[in-house]
Swiss-Prot record:
Pfam families: LIAS_N (PF16881), Radical_SAM (PF04055). [4Fe-4S] cluster 2 binds at residues 93, 97, 100. Residues 79-296 form the Radical SAM core domain. Its EC number is 2.8.1.8. One of its GO terms (cellular component) is cytoplasm. Keywords: 4Fe-4S, Cytoplasm, Iron, Iron-sulfur, Metal-binding, S-adenosyl-L-methionine, Transferase. This is Lipoyl synthase. The gene is lipA. It is found in: Cytoplasm. InterPro entries: Aldolase_TIM, Elp3/MiaA/NifB-like_rSAM, LIAS_N, Lipoyl_synth, rSAM. Belongs to the radical SAM superfamily. Lipoyl synthase family. Pathway: Protein modification; protein lipoylation via endogenous pathway; protein N(6)-(lipoyl)lysine from octanoyl-[acyl-carrier-protein]: step 2/2.
Length: 320
């Protein structure tokens, strides 16, 4: 008889320990993988002083970056430019999406001092634009929305004039309560990723719902019509270009004006494999179509991620 898997609180479960308990699809770690094309190969910068400086600054304050926790391919570039996306509410997610490298498990209670520590770190780094994201916290009554609001409040208190983008989870089952918590301390940009097409949601985002995510974006825009909303899509997971275009149209129909679209990369052999590497010219075509749909800002390219050059995109610069 097999002993049921029991998670310990505060322990990070990654790779096979994480994806083996997803009931939707078993991933064969020995399967043959697609070879990376030349356009997907990154040359890492030689100078790591800035990278170490940012990492050390976060360690001193007990903070996390999604750049490290999700193994982002742009980490070296962004850290060398002195930018990072902070991840609040711990580094353990209550979901176990098989595309994501963030650890799964039973998270510890939120750190009540984190908003102040975050604000002080941002002040030390002299940032003028900051992105705040989080793991999913389905264990919390408000799904972590109150903690987001407190972070925004403390950041603005110590950093007047700063621009704040929040990249939020779907606040499953608590949209109204979550948006109520954000009313007094809204961000400058509200970001929530759809990730991929609805046909593949059960496989890619177990525990999430496509229409629920659209509802979150729409309801935020209804309450805060002057604040831009943003969403991100990954390609290369088995979707068709026509399906991606429909997702883009769904976003526009729900008031979203900022888009990021990038290539999915497999974090390990225990994650979903890449079904296709989308060539750069197709990303250019997606950008052209996004602009025709009415997106004010569309960052489309192989290495584009949700917060990649977020400050540049928010100011209207071309990101690809």
């Amino acid at each position: 008889m097999t002993t049921p898997f029991k998670m310990e609180r505060g322990v990070k479960y990654r790779d096979a320990a994480k994806t083996s308990i997803i009931p939707v699809k078993n991933i064969d770690p020995n399967q043959e993988l697609l070879k990376k094309p030349e356009w997907m190969k990154i040359k890492l910068p030689a100078n790591s002083a800035k990278i170490n400086s940012i990492k050390n600054g976060m360690r001193r304050h007990g903070l996390h970056s999604v750049c490290e926790e999700a193994s982002c391919p742009n980490l070296h570039e962004c850290f060398n430019h002195g930018t990072a996306t902070f991840m609040i509410l711990g580094a353990i997610c209550t979901r176990r999406c098989p595309f994501c490298d963030v650890a799964h498990g039973k998270p510890l209670p939120p750190d009540p001092d984190e908003p102040k520590k975050l604000a002080e770190t941002i002040q030390d780094m002299k940032l003028r634009y900051v992105v705040i994201t989080s793991v999913d916290r389905d264990d919390l009554p408000d799904r972590g929305a109150g903690h987001f609001a407190e972070c925004v409040k403390e950041i603005r208190k110590l950093n007047p004039g700063i621009k704040i983008e929040i990249l939020v989870p779907d606040f499953r089952g608590r949209i109204e309560q979550a948006l109520e918590k954000l009313k007094d301390n809204p961000p400058d940009v509200f970001n929530h990723n759809l990730e991929n097409v609805p046909r593949l949601y059960r496989e890619i985002r177990p525990g999430a719902d496509y229409n629920w995510s659209l509802k979150l974006l729409k309801e935020f825009k209804t309450i805060f019509p002057h604040i831009p909303t943003k969403s991100g899509i990954m390609v290369g997971l088995g979707e068709t270009n026509e399906e991606i275009l429909q997702v883009m149209q769904d976003l526009r129909d729900n008031g979203v004006t900022m888009l990021t679209l990038g290539q999915y990369l497999q974090p390990s052999r225990h994650h979903l494999p890449v079904a296709r590497y989308v060539p750069p010219e197709e990303f250019d075509d997606f950008r052209d179509k996004a602009e025709k749909m009415g997106f004010e800002h569309a960052a489309c390219g192989p290495f584009v991620r949700s917060s990649y050059h977020a400050d540049l995109q928010a100011s209207g610069g071309l990101v690809k």
